[in-house]
Amino acid sequence: MIWPVYYALARGLFSRYPLPPGSMIHLDIEEKNNRCRLLDLAAEHGPVFKAIAWSELWVCIVGLTRCTRFINENKQRIRPVTIDVTRLYAKGFLRQMIGEEHRHYRKPLVVALRDEKVSSLLPQLRPIVDRVLADYARRQSVTEPPLPETLLAALSEISSRQLIRIIFGSPDQSAFSERLFAGYRDLGPHGLVWNQGPRQERAFTALRRMILDEVRDAPGEAGGAVRRLHAMGAFDETMLGHAIMMVEMGRYDLQGFFRWLLRYAGQNPAIIDRIALENETEPAEGNSLARSFVLETFRMDQSERLIRRAEQDIVFDGWLIPRHTKIRLCLWESHKAADHFPEPFAFHPERFRAGDRPADQFSPFGLDEHYCPLAEIAMMLGTLFVRAVAQRYRIESIADGTPLRGAYHWEPSARFTVLLHPRDGHDA
C-alpha cells in the first residue's frame, strides 16, 4: 500500500464518518479471475464499498441512480480519470476537462457530430465494411481458421477508416485518407496509445501536420467534423488534438465492440437470420432488431465503468470517501439489475425492441456532461456492422472461450475468431 491508502485509513480513524465497508482485497487481481466479483461484493457489503486496486484505495458504487446522484452532489469535488495524453497535446482528453473549459470544447464538437450529418455518410461507410470483410472471407480457410490477429486487423481497419471518414471528411481510399490511415498505424500499431514515447510523439506530430495542411489547402471541402469545426471558428490546437485522439480511442473501442458483436452473432444465428431479412429503416416507434442487438451487446459488454478521483474529502450516503480516492461508478454491474433486466446474464435483444431504456436503467455512454459525444455514432456504426454481417454471411465462431480482462476493456477470449460463410447470392 502507498501513501494515499494510509492517508485514507488515517482519515477514517479521525472522522465522524466511517469509511465504506469492505476489506482491503486487491480488486484488480480478484476481478480478473471473477468478472462478477464486484456484484458479489455489493451483495455482501451493500452498493457502496471499498477495496484496493493498483496500490490505491478505490470506492465502488453500484446502481445508476446512485451513481448519478453521487456525480451531481459532488461535481466540484471530483475529477474524471482517463489516460494522460498531455505529452501529445497540452490540455489532454476532452473527457478529463471540467467546467467552462469542458463546455467550450464540447459544445461545438457535439454540433459538428450531429446525427443527421453522420447518418448522411452511411452509404459511404457501408462499403468499407463490405470490402474489408469480403477480403477477410476470401483469405480464410476451413482447415486453417483465421488467426485472432487477422480478425483484429480487419476490424481495426473497418473502425479506423470509418472514423477517419466521419471526423476528417476525406473519402475512403483517397490519397489523404490513406495517409491518415498509415499515420494512425504509426501512432498505435498494437492498439490504444496507452503510454506515449518519442515514437508516438513523432506520429502525433505527423498527423497534426498533415491535417492542418489539408484544412488550409481545402478549407471549404464538404464533409467531416473537422471542416465543420473550422467553418464554425472552433478549430484550434486543442480541438485538433481532440479530433486526433477521438479517432485513436474510438477505433480501438469500436474494434473491440465489433468483436463482441461477432461473438453474439455466432452464438445467436437465428437472430442474425432475422436481421438479414429486416428492413434497414428504423421503425417509427421502438427499435429495429439490429439496433436492439447493438444495445443488448452494450448492456452485456464493453460499457463497464466510469472513474473519478476525489479532489477533497467527500461524505456520501454516510460514508467517508477521502481525498485522493479513486471512485469506480459501476456501469456493467448496474446493467445487470434483475428488476430492470430479467435474466440479466442472458442475451435478449428483444428487451430493447420497445425502445431505448431510461438513463436510470441503462446508460452505456456516461452519466453526466461527459456523456460520450460519439455515442450515437457508435450506435449507427454498430447497427450498420451487424446488418452488413447478417445480410452477407453466416458466422461460425472459433475458440469462443471465457472472456478475459484486457488492458482497458473486457474482451472475448484471446483465441476467439470467426469464419464467415457467404449466404446464397453473396460471394466472399
Regions of interest found by a model, annotated:
Residues 1-86, 361:
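N-terminal membrane-proximal hinge/A-helix region immediately C-terminal to the signal-anchor transmembrane segment
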Residues 2-10, 79-83, 91-126, 171-179, ...:
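Cytochrome P450
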Residues 26-40, 44-46, 282-319:
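Conserved cytochrome P450 K-helix E-x-x-R motif and the immediately C-terminal K′/meander segment
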Residues 118-256:
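Cytochrome P450 heme-thiolate monooxygenase catalytic core
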Residues 251-278, 375-393:
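Cytochrome P450 catalytic-core helices
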Residues 322-323:
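Residue-level recognition of short, solvent-exposed, well-ordered loop/turn junctions
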Residues 330-356, 365:
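Conserved cytochrome P450 K-helix/beta-meander segment immediately N-terminal to the heme-binding cysteine loop
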Residues 353-414:
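Cytochrome P450 heme-thiolate "Cys pocket" and heme-binding signature region
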